[in-house]
A protein has these predicted regions:
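Conserved acidic carboxylate
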Residues: 33
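Charged docking surfaces used in two-component/phosphorelay signaling
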Residues: 40-48
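C-terminal output helix
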Residues: 43, 126-139
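Acidic, metal-coordinating helix/loop segments flanking the phosphotransfer/catalytic sites
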Residues: 30, 43, 55-75
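Active-site residues of response regulator receiver
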Residues: 79
Length: 141
């Protein structure tokens, strides 16, 4: 289980019922998370499930990656609270450039969501299976 409490991060990686895929899905996710250990766990889970993943520490890095690889990115998976540029601001920028970009926001603070973006949300803490299920659900919309 990914368990995050307050500003300090407690991480537990539990067992999963989801088996790794044998072939990549060919879908690409731009993962934006400022906590390195959390970003690494999420990226590993997504890659093991067959997704291609670009990783960014903050919104500014994500914008640069989107400039370089935007055509191949299927989903933005972003933390909402980050330094320099939060997830909502980043989502606004990227949706302004590509209206059909799939969005999934993760946060321990669900009160900060922007209804105008019509984004999907996953509240921390959550399990690996919860993450993979929600990612698949959003990509399939």
């Amino acid at each position: 289980m990914f368990d995050l409490q307050g500003r300090s991060t407690l991480l537990r990686y539990g067992t999963s019922k989801t088996q790794p895929m044998t072939e990549p899905t060919l879908e690409t996710i731009l993962l934006v998370e400022d906590e390195p250990a959390v970003r690494n766990l999420f990226a590993q889970a997504l890659k093991r499930a067959g997704y291609s993943v670009y990783e960014a520490r903050n919104g500014q890095e994500a914008m640069k990656l989107f400039d370089q690889h935007g055509e191949s990115i299927d989903m933005l998976l972003t933390d909402m609270r980050m330094p320099y540029m939060g997830g909502a601001e980043l989502a606004h920028h990227l949706r302004g450039r590509r209206r059909n970009l799939k969005l999934l926001c993760i946060s321990g603070y669900p009160g900060n969501l922007d209804a105008e973006l019509a984004i999907d949300f996953l509240a921390k803490p959550f399990s690996r299976d919860d993450l993979l299920k929600k990612v698949r659900e959003v990509l399939d919309k």
